[in-house]
């Protein structure tokens, strides 16, 4: 007797689905029976991701900070008639120490990580099925201070605040809202870092290594599926213990 797939017949939206955690989640969701819409800012990378996922996927080019792009995304999603899962994964990380923070740096991070995430979810609501799942991609930086990461950490702390509020806002629709907060993860964001910087990062993680995108994707699958039917309003750390010590 074959095992039932955890997302059989469900429709999921994953922003930032062309690489790293978003791509890993899209592959896993499709494997578990979902039809997935992914977004990315660059068409070439989007096309490559769609090819890598292979089936039951539509790619929609766009920037989550651009509300017109979000409208275009949900116009495409509307062809499926509903959404069961929103994984607001897209975001940006940049360093700037206090004293060197520019208005441009501040505005860019809040525009994408906070405004973009908020409107990704809000514009999904008309299509989001009662009993559906909202998942935000946060960061251990929401609770763990890191040099020159003050603005980024503040944007991720805002996501924690969002899910607390949305749990109440959406309770009558039984829509669950949770945030995954990864620690340092081996994604393209890390690729450009010097070896000594990566070594310093790893030294702060009790498990002695960075996370893998697939490990974060498995947690997203848990929160997307009925396995987490009584889980809402939480920040779930997937950080190798970094934020806990």
Locate the predicted segments by residue.
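Conserved glycine-rich cofactor-binding loop
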Residues: 11, 18-19
């Amino acid at each position: 007797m074959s095992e039932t797939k955890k997302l059989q017949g469900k429709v999921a939206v994953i922003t930032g689905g062309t690489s790293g955690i978003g791509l890993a989640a899209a592959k896993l969701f499709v494997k578990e029976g979902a039809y997935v819409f992914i977004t990315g800012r660059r068409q070439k990378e989007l096309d490559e991701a769609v090819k890598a996922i292979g089936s039951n996927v539509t790619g929609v080019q766009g920037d989550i900070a651009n509300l017109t792009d979000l409208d275009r995304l949900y116009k495409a999603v509307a062809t499926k008639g509903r959404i069961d899962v929103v994984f607001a994964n897209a975001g940006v990380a940049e360093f700037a120490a206090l004293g060197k923070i520019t208005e441009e740096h501040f505005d860019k991070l809040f525009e994408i990580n906070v405004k973009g995430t908020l409107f990704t979810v809000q514009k999904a609501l008309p299509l989001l099925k009662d009993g559906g799942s909202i998942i935000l991609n946060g960061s251990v930086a929401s609770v763990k201070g890191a040099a020159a990461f003050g603005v980024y950490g503040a944007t991720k702390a805002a996501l924690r605040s969002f899910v607390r509020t949305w749990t109440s806002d959406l309770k009558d629709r039984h829509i669950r809202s949770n945030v995954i907060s990864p620690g340092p993860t081996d994604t393209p964001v890390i690729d450009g870092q010097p070896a000594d910087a990566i070594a310093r990062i790893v030294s702060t993680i009790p498990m002695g290594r960075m996370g893998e995108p697939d490990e974060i994707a498995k947690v997203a699958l848990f929160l997307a599926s009925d396995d987490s039917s009584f889980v809402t309003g939480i920040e779930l750390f997937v950080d190798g213990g970094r934020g806990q010590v």
